[in-house]
Regions:
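Intrinsically disordered, charged and Pro/Gly-enriched terminal/linker segments
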Residues: 1-173
Length: 173
């Protein structure tokens, strides 16, 4: 332990925590080091998926604002990493891995429009059109019933392009 004034810190030369490993993996994935191949990036995403056990615990007493911010930060980093891995897996034509990673992202951010679009695109490429319809319809239902809103125009266009088989329309993932 290191102390400075009223602050306390962990000496990273002697202690490694799961959050430190998470941050290091997320940094490597999101910053896309030049010497990292697509397969290495996918492996890093799968390790991150294994490491991430869900949203950070938020205590139910005292000032919890720090924990709430950290929870949101880690969740966003996780989803962004899964999205990056899914896109790389698609580029490598590895649909099972792309599907695994996008499903992990959907579990953590079921209302994020970019995740919905990417999931629809991956499901469509894998021939899972029924799942595209179910995902989109459930997304629309939640938005209309709970948030009194509609999907973003890009999401609507992506869905229509998949359903109508219009490959000329760019699927915005």
């Amino acid at each position: 332990m290191l102390t400075q004034g009223e602050g306390v810190a962990i000496n990273t030369e002697y202690v490694v925590s799961d959050t430190m490993r998470f941050d290091a993996l997320a940094r490597d994935i999101l910053l896309g080091r030049a010497r990292t191949t697509g397969r290495q990036l996918i492996e890093a995403c799968l390790r991150l998926d294994e490491l991430y056990t869900g949203p950070l615990y938020v205590p139910n007493f005292g000032d919890t604002s720090f924990y709430v911010r950290q929870r949101r930060l880690y969740q966003t980093k996780f989803v962004d990493c899964m999205m990056r891995g899914a896109h790389v897996a698609l580029e490598l034509d590895d649909l099972p891995v792309a599907s695994w990673l996008i499903d992990a992202a959907l579990r953590q951010a079921p209302l994020r429009e970019d995740v919905i679009r990417a999931a629809m695109h991956i499901y469509d490429k894998g021939g899972r059109r029924r799942e595209v319809v179910e995902l989109y319809n459930s997304h629309v239902h939640v938005l209309e019933q709970e948030l009194h809103s509609l999907p973003e125009r890009e999401t609507q266009m992506a869905y229509e392009a998949i359903i109508h088989g219009d490959r000329e329309v760019e699927l915005l993932a």
